[in-house]
């Protein structure tokens, strides 16, 4: 859909999904998340070298795993000028009522196991705040059984204070479609409109 709208698109595979199976430990990575972030950053390097891509006009969009990886990558790389996350996050403390087991697999962030839940040194409110003043849109469905929309709102409320310091609170927006763990057309259209405005 983005390509049909004229956007140059790159959709990197996540480590150990589909056919992409790098040995991230042998490559020096502790987690699949950091390998994915590095792959995404290298993808930005490729896009940056393409004459078809406008300088400063790169966005990140993703659903579920792609949704939090859009946030992670944009936190590490300011070349991403706008970010969209669908069903991609809530706070670690709210996730599955505090059971972060799935976040601690080697595919994600195994070092989270080293911390008590309340002592994890970062959470999504920190990462979303770090995106400011860049535009950020999150679709957090009312019936998502993975990420709680109420927690998404709490994350956004905390991050919005940083957006306010920049005087751009309106650049952080959240929507709650009445669906399950999905990225419905109405939300995708809203995401594409954000990209059309900012990229």
Which residues does each predicted region cover?
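Flexible loop/turn segments at secondary-structure boundaries
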Residues: 17-20, 67-69, 90-95, 137-138, ...
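Cap/lid segment of the alpha/beta-hydrolase catalytic domain
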Residues: 1-49, 94-99
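Generic structural signal for well-ordered alpha-helices
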Residues: 41-44, 128, 156, 160, ...
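Alpha-helix capping and helix-loop boundary segments enriched in small/acidic/polar residues
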Residues: 27-35, 60-65, 71, 114-122, ...
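Catalytic His-Asp charge-relay segment
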Residues: 134-140, 173-175
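Primarily recognizes the serine-hydrolase "nucleophile elbow" in alpha/beta-hydrolase
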Residues: 5, 42-118
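C-terminal catalytic histidine-bearing segment of alpha/beta-hydrolase fold enzymes
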Residues: 157-158, 162-199
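Mobile cap/lid helix-loop segments that gate and shape the active-site cleft of serine hydrolases
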Residues: 82-128, 133, 142-156, 164-168
């Amino acid at each position: 859909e983005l390509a049909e709208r004229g956007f140059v698109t790159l959709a990197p595979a996540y480590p150990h999904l589909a056919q992409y199976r790098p040995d991230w430990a042998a490559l020096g990575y502790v987690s699949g998340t950091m390998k994915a972030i590095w792959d995404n950053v290298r993808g930005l390097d490729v896009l940056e070298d393409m004459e078809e891509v406008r300088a400063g006009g790169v966005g990140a969009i993703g659903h579920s795993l792609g949704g939090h990886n859009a946030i992670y990558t944009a936190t590490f790389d300011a070349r991403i000028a706008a970010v969209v996350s669908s069903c991609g996050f809530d706070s670690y403390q709210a996730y599955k009522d505090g059971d972060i087991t799935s976040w601690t697999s080697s595919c994600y962030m195994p070092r989270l196991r080293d911390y008590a839940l309340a002592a994890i040194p970062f959470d999504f409110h920190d990462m979303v705040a770090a995106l400011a003043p860049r535009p950020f849109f999150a679709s957090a469905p009312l019936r998502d059984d993975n990420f709680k929309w109420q927690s998404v709102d709490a994350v956004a409320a905390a991050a919005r204070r940083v957006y306010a310091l920049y005087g751009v609170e309106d650049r952080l927006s959240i929507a709650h479609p009445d669906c399950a763990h999905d990225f419905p057309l109405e939300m995708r259209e809203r995401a594409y409109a954000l990209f059309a405005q900012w990229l």
